[in-house]
Amino acid sequence: MSRTPIIAGNWKLHMNPEQTAEFVDAVKDKLPDPSKVESLICAPAVDLDALRKAAKGSNLHIGAENCYFEDEGAYTGETSPKVLKEMGIDYVIIGHSERRGYFHETDEDINKKAKAIFANGLKPIICCGESLETREANKQEDWVVGQIKAALDGLTAEQVSNLVIAYEPIWAIGTGKTASSDQAEEMCKTIRETVKDLYNEETAENVRIQYGGSVKPANVKELMSKPDIDGGLVGGASLKPESYLELVNYQD
């Protein structure tokens, strides 16, 4: 099974619409063939319209950084997956450790969001990852496997084949620390084996698994050389056109 690599920028709470348009203008003609690498930017909700308009006709896919699990209703401040689909968005990040930590999102919330995202014809990027304390206690596999089982509960094999799982050890996000390529591969392999146990070998071979946590041009090639790492979820290094282009064109 040949899985198309996917490099996704997660802009977090950075960039305004003007900066977004300038960024896309700088990268849109230099992106790799989408059959070789899928190039994705996940932007704040206030930038999505500018991103969509600027990226029109290019190889750049567009993602949101979060959504709610209801399409509409009295949910002040939330983002509708239905409206994201109507806007032409492709992916939605859910379960990021910053959402789990700062906004107290639970595994149940993330599972509901995954179902709502699929119900609206979008694709989730489901984040998982352990704290430094969990790793030092050598309980990282149990922790991440538990997150995966909870997030995928009730999803079909076909749905799981079409989603992306992003392994982001919390201790490596924005810290400059990176899991070694062997540590990252070990956990991504465990995630794939978990999908196989929950579904079947075909589903496990189809699902794409990213590594996230201080991914940058200097380490992307080594990470992407590992058999179970299919992409990167990139924070700070995705904010500058030059470094983003180095990341998505890592095969050159």
From Swiss-Prot:
Q: What's one GO BP annotation on this UniProt entry?
A: glycolytic process
A Pfam family hit: TIM
GO CC aspect terms: cytosol
Task: Report the pathway entry.
Answer: Carbohydrate biosynthesis; gluconeogenesis; Carbohydrate degradation; glycolysis; D-glyceraldehyde 3-phosphate from glycerone phosphate: step 1/1
Q: Which InterPro entries match?
A: Aldolase_TIM, TIM_sf, TrioseP_Isoase_bac/euk, Triosephosphate_isomerase, Triosephosphate_isomerase_AS
List the subcellular locations: Cytoplasm
Q: Keyword annotations for this protein?
A: Cytoplasm, Gluconeogenesis, Glycolysis, Isomerase
Reaction equation(s) it catalyzes = D-glyceraldehyde 3-phosphate = dihydroxyacetone phosphate
The active site of this protein is located at 96 (electrophile), 168 (proton acceptor)
Binding-site residues for substrate, renumbered to this chain: 10-12, 174, 214, 235-236
Q: Does the keyword Isomerase apply?
A: yes
What Gene3D superfamilies has UniProt attached to this entry?
Aldolase class I
Q: Where is the major localization of this protein?
A: cytoplasm
Molecular-function GO term, any one = triose-phosphate isomerase activity
Q: Which residues form a coiled coil?
A: none
User: According to the UniProt entry, what is the EC number of this protein?
Assistant: 5.3.1.1
Q: Which family does it belong to?
A: Belongs to the triosephosphate isomerase family.
- Fetch the HAMAP family from UniProt: TIM_B
Q: What does this protein do?
A: Involved in the gluconeogenesis. Catalyzes stereospecifically the conversion of dihydroxyacetone phosphate (DHAP) to D-glyceraldehyde-3-phosphate (G3P).
Q: How does it assemble?
A: Homodimer.
What this protein is called in its record is Triosephosphate isomerase
Which species expresses this protein natively? Lactobacillus helveticus (strain DPC 4571)
Task: List the gene name.
Answer: tpiA
